[in-house]
Amino acid sequence: MRLRSLVGNRAEIVGPETSVVDVAKVMLEHNVAAVAVVDRTGLIGICTDRDLARGLATGCDDSALASDLMTASPDVVGPDIEVSDAAAWMLETGYRHLPVVEDGELLGIVDIRDVLWALVSPDA
């Protein structure tokens, strides 16, 4: 099974100037733990629940922006990578979210739950 089959709707997207409060609201509203940070050139970062927690723990306030806390220039994967290879890479790197990009276009973000479900699901 390839990641393409796990990428559903597009990722939730915010701009680099989005406040961290609004980033948290997007995550809560859409029940996601990561959002893509995109500008006019495309994907420039990913902001996760861990990034928000790290920011709070190190003293950022509600005036901070997505660009202040995001992981800039995140590693990305293509949609045709095998789920098992993605799982191995996530284990090796500690990543819990993988932006899936094809021909420069963000298709979505696959998280560790998606990957684990695909590996253990009898329908996979």
Task: Give residue ranges: language-model regions.
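A glycine-centered beta-loop-beta connector
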Residues: 27-30, 35-51, 90, 98-113
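Short hydrophobic/aromatic-rich motifs at helix boundaries and adjacent loops
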Residues: 22-25, 37-39, 57-60, 69
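Tandem CBS (Bateman) regulatory domains
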Residues: 1-10, 48-78, 82-91, 106-107, ...
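The conserved cystathionine-beta-synthase
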Residues: 13-31, 38, 77-94, 101, ...
